[in-house]
Curated annotation (Swiss-Prot):
Listed EC numbers: 3.2.1.21
Pathway(s) this gene product operates in, as recorded in its UniProt entry: Glycan metabolism; cellulose degradation
Active site feature: 303
Family of the protein in this entry: Belongs to the glycosyl hydrolase 3 family.
Annotated signal peptide: 1-19
Alphabetically ordered keywords of this record: Carbohydrate metabolism, Cellulose degradation, Glycoprotein, Glycosidase, Hydrolase, Polysaccharide degradation, Secreted, Signal
Protein name per the record: Probable beta-glucosidase M
Organism: Aspergillus terreus (strain NIH 2624 / FGSC A1156)
Amino acid sequence: MHSFLGLVGLLAGVSVSSAAPSVQNITSDTYFYGQSPPVYPSPEGNGTGSWAVAYQKAKAFVAQLTSEEKVNLTAGVTSDTGCSGMIPAIPRLNFPGLCVSDAGDGLRGTDYVNSWPSGIHAGASWNKNLARQRAYHMGTEFHKKGVNVLLGPVVAPLGRVVEGGRNWEGFSNDPYLSGALVYETVKGIQSAGVGACTKVRFPQRLQSSGSNLVQHFTGYEQETNRNPETVDGVDIASVSSNIDDKAMHELYLWPFQDAVHAGSVSVMCSYQRINNSYACQNSKTLNGLLKTELGFQGYVMTDWYGQHGGIAAANAGLDMVMPYTELWGSNLTDAISNGTMEASRLDDMATRIIASWYQVNQNKNFPAPGIGMPADVNEPHQAVIGKSPDSRTTLLQGAIEGHVLVKNTKQALPLQSPRLLSVFGYDAKAGDSLIVNDVSFVNASVQKNHTLYVGGGSGTNSAAYVLAPLDAVQQQAYEDGTSVLWDVVSEDPDVDATTDACLVFINAYATEGYDRPGLVNKESDTLITNVAGKCNNTIVTIHNAGIRLVGDWINHENVTAVIFAHLPGQDTGKALVELLYGRANPSGRLPYTVAKRAGDYGSLLHPSQPEGKYGLFPQSDFSEGVFIDYRAFDKQGIEPQFEFGFGLSYTSFNYSGLAVKKVNRTTEPYPASAPVQEGGNPNLWDEILTVSAKVQNSGSMDGDEVAQLYLGIPNAPVRQLRGFEKVGIPAGQAVNVKFSLTRRDLSVWDTEAQQWKLQSGDYQVYVGRSSRDLPLKGQFSI
């Protein structure tokens, strides 16, 4: 991308290496000036849409503040709580301060809370209603613990880099699926206790209990070089995500647009650089894309220690620094005095923060910030119960629906009254301890000696208990009178020749701070082939924090069933047993593409590394544009092991009766001009097309099907997900599934007009079971 971003100062900061005279090493960031267009000034929040009352109150509040009090709202401070970050109180105006804490799959570092299914698990459920329920119940736990801001959900990384260490925190590699689920998640968190959600009655005693923070804005796709570092006395900058305008809008910005449209009150900017400008002081992305184009009314917070500039960051659109700042404080008021920053910018920063507090009604009967977040749970503290019996059904259902059955031969599953089960693999058992601890970062491909139910880093969570697979299998065996043998240590275990089934448990670990060392693990694969060599009914379960390749053994005749179990949270074993024994029917679908071999992912397999003249300023060129995951496989004609959207069931579904109907709305190329609302031009959400199809359960077991709609848009990838509905269908019955498509769904980003544009020509419509199993095909024209 270096050749076409309009380099300014081409020769600035270039030196000739004596070790390699032919290589000109870039030694100053002035070389990159101008690659990310400047957008100033930072737009003031205007209280559009549902924010009007909150802004009215916030402006009146901020008008009473001293300059010092305004500044204090913009940066975290140390506290005697276990909150990840704290904004100080303003006692004279009855503002109690703010507690912000991880994570997007449940609270971390405290007690009396639940470990919820992770983002990738929710993504694999393909269930919008369940995503909202999960978010609501998580939100109530944060509320009870006095946490004002939930640091989640995550929609970046999107999953561009297959080995990305934090891909598991997000929902999917597809922007549409990720966007649909983040919309429901934001709604669930921020409306906890106020609104109603399908199949859930929300107690009225909680009033808009929580707010969320969507992260990480944007283009944050690898851990390698995510932060600047010093190696042998040499400073190396953060990696730069070099993203063109089209890919930015059609991939990386898409789910953030859905989050803003849902009303998210805050957004976290990311660590890395975007087009060679640090994300937390990138005026193009913060002022231009987020606050102007998307009409974002909330505030922008740094990731922890993610501030790299002082007044420049404030002018570029940053509103809050965590966990503290060394660059703001009195420097903000000094900047106003010397004219390098407008007083209105500080007012807007404070107003956005306070408006967000009012927007979720935290001025009314909210617990004291951090009341349930002790700094050290091993010291005497008040027991504040976050978890609730009301959440148990959602907790278990969420764990169940994120499992994806990808192989099931010889009628291996569901299990039919086995006399003897044999359990193998390090992932089968619970760990040797379960204590409340802080974040940990371990660079490993697997987690040995315990079942993997959540990933590593700041996105991990605290559990009320962990019901591991081996424990759950034994509980079921006790009820049924089944014998159970196990060896969860050996790589080549003995197998009783009369066993009915061998259950093998492995995992694929990932964590913040490191990109994954690979997509396979030799010891785990050897274990599987060793067991399969002795057992003709080997059922493999993989708890995977990301894509896991299975090509070395997937076609082994004795490997009869395989489940991608992802990261189910604390109900991991209970959920799995419900599926193994057929009390629940598998309904998860892959939110990513599983290749046959690592090389099929091409340049998207590994993170970018510092190299050549960019050794001090690592570059990650997103030169593939919009072609990641299944889009890339489709473009290159590569057959995957398991395609995006794939998943098996214990029943079967038939599709028929496709109907495509254009709604009576204008189909002019560009949307009509309108005042920007949350999420952008409101006309982007006009319904343009409806599609319906009949889905019949032709099997003998009740089940849930995920009907998926893909569009072939002219001048775009051959197929893109643009609709999905998860429907429960009793055996032998049929339902009519309807999809509603908006102007945005049918458009591509016009880089010249800087607008979403409908294409002239024939659109292809596909409906079916996955991105490559699409029995229904139709067409319409614009």
